[in-house]
Amino acid sequence: MRRKKFVSMLLVATMAATLFAGCGNDSGKKGSSGGAKEFDAFFAVPGSEINDDNEIQKIIEEKTGVRVKETWLTGQTADEAVGTMIAGGEYPDFIDGISGQKQLYDAGALVPLDDYIEKYPNIKNLFTELEWEKLRQDDGHIYWIPQFSCIKGDEKVCTHNDEAFWIQARVLKWAGYPEIKTLDQYFDLIEKYNEANPTMADGTENIPYTILCEDWRYFCLENAPQFLDGYPNDGSCMVDPDTKKVLDYNTSDTAVEYFKKLNEEYNKGIVDPESFTQTYDEYISKLSTGRVLGMIDQWWDFAYTAGDAIKQAGLDEQGCDYIPVPVTIDGRDNQWHNAGGAFNASTGLAVTTSCDDVDAAMKFVNDLLDQDIHNLRYWGVKGTDYEVDENGEFYKTADERKKASDTAYKASHSCPYSYFPQYNGTSDDGINANKPDGQAREFYDGLNSDVKEVFDAYGVKTYVEMLGTNNAPGDWYPMWSFSNNFTTDTPGGAAWTKIGELKHAELPKVVMAKDFDSAWDTYMDKYNACNPQDFLGELQTELDKRLEQAAKFK
């Protein structure tokens, strides 16, 4: 079985959000309907609430004897939310603390899962022996299960869930579907389109280019240089595939060119002046109106919220959907999309010490991975959410597709348990994708008309084909699965924290500066004072360790 995929937050927007205060522990209590066992869960990411009488959740409850009340992050950072829990000593039954996961482990709040992994075959079969080994902590035990890192059977992928430069379909159509390969070409097209078409059909002014910078999502500003140099998403660094050495994208020639370009575009009025103060919700709201012509972001960060809103508002008819274009600094090939995804060992679903029936909790995780229940989670109910043709292939009608993007319908009907372990790839039937967005025919048939026009013009059928596919970079990949768990307990972690704080404070000033060269020099002086060699050194040590570990399993 092949696997992986951290779509990291690939399904952030399909999830539900209630107040963090709702995370009290009720594990083991019987529900009022049918005597189902009830657990609670907290995931340190934002989302949207589902209804208490959700229809598919009820079906899953009938099949498993369990229901889980999921709560999500609101009004705090992940680290703040986790810190509050640790201070109080009370936890939900299930948790994914995201950037706060290591805090939970260090606080002794998590239960070792080794015995349960061996007991329940669906869980055990998620990963290879090497991948399970990567999850062992310094005490030798496994405490969490990555949710998005399993590709079951043959890989089926149509979307690019990672980072890219995105541009609206209407811009490409207006220009006659040109080849966009460089950063200069990208911004030149946005400038020309906005000059010729400064407003939407209703007179609302376009926003040519916006940047999301809030909290951890400031990757939309700071890490573009690695992609512009054509590298895959190692997150905290670049890795030379030949020498296996860590490279610092923050100080590269491309970093200078990129931020200088942003500075020029800001001073031309192309970059949204609210970029550095807007919240994530405000950013999604802007995208949802169709006003934003382009941005850099990861698919999972906007597609399931803004994308659905664009469809529901009929803005696809104006060409407001987003298309990825393979922009690099000088037109070189990119390695953005990789076959096999990425294994994220830094966090995952954990069970806490507050859970009074760990075995039942883990049995539920195992049950959620039964194929029929997995189909309920991601395809829905046959005859209501999807149909089956004479060859056994799943598909949706136009009405079913419309319902699937409707917020109210999702709240009342859909229950993906989206931060529990799941499959990408191929169903046990050998025919269907485990999720609709991997089903090639259904994916293409369900595209908005403006996206279809773009794909037809470029001779492609998927977002992936717009960018190209590459083999997995190497056994070290991805390095962000290490740096995500940096703490200030090590020199490298302390340097990483200082650099993050510096970027938040100084990179907006660089972009807005009247004198770019002076602002960049000041930023570099401050950057070097953070001792980046410490975090780069720890990254190199981890990279070497991963290569050595992988060699033992070959």
Predicted regions and their residues:
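Helix-loop-helix "hinge/cap" segment bordering the ligand-binding cleft or interdomain interface
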Residues: 141, 146-219, 240-286, 291, ...
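Polar, glycine-rich mid-to-C-terminal structural blocks
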Residues: 319, 324-326, 337-408, 412-415
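C-terminal motif of bacterial Sec signal peptides marking the signal peptidase cleavage site
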Residues: 18-22
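Positively charged n-region of N-terminal signal peptides that target proteins for export
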Residues: 1-6
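Conserved small-residue motifs centered on glycine
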Residues: 374-505
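Ligand-binding "clamshell"
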Residues: 103-116, 141, 198, 305-335
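Conserved N-terminal structural module of periplasmic/extracytoplasmic solute-binding proteins
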Residues: 8, 23-185, 197, 223, ...
